[in-house]
């Protein structure tokens, strides 16, 4: 057994997950049952051919891998209360924490998939992968692994939060999440893994110029514009001031600035 919290917590985890009353076959059976329960939530019909069977195998293999992440980082104490070691500030804190996810890779399809199949669970994930990291570090993550890791461009945390809330998912603190979104949209972070690189040029010019010190200029401009579109739609849902709506509505069209009309 293992724990990020303490030796005592590792024993709690072990006794909860592998009590003496269960043997190897019991655990194997429970694992098979748990996975079949999840994978049976979608039924795929295929033609009875090598091609059809191959596609069916491919679908369920991808479904299985989709459910592996984000990873649950929190643990349950002896009273069943959620607690976690924070990779953001080194403290032991209450509540959920999820990690091991890069949003540039997952905002397009994975999180929309969760919102359809696991709406209630997604709310807890939002609290654990967006809200709590912001409270513990002052920044929304873009790739948590398990803390802030530098790789992903854009601020797609905003896109994921906006989609979840607009689709009716409410069991997370949207007000804290929105504060994090606004902070990301206006600032470069103290680490290159958070905030927006080139944000001053982007907000002033409507794009990140090629001769700036920031790489991936066009890609970042496109990502930021989509992120700002998402913020605009979320701000509408939250009844934010019109002046604020106008800012993000304008920025949402900055993608046009990197297209050559010829």
Predicted feature residues:
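Acidic/polar, glycine-enriched structural segments that form the non-catalytic walls/loops
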Residues: 1-97, 141, 170-171, 175, ...
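Flexible loop/turn segments at secondary-structure boundaries
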Residues: 5-8, 69-73, 83, 110-111, ...
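Alpha-helical support elements that line or immediately flank enzyme active sites
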Residues: 61-75, 99-101, 105-122, 162-168, ...
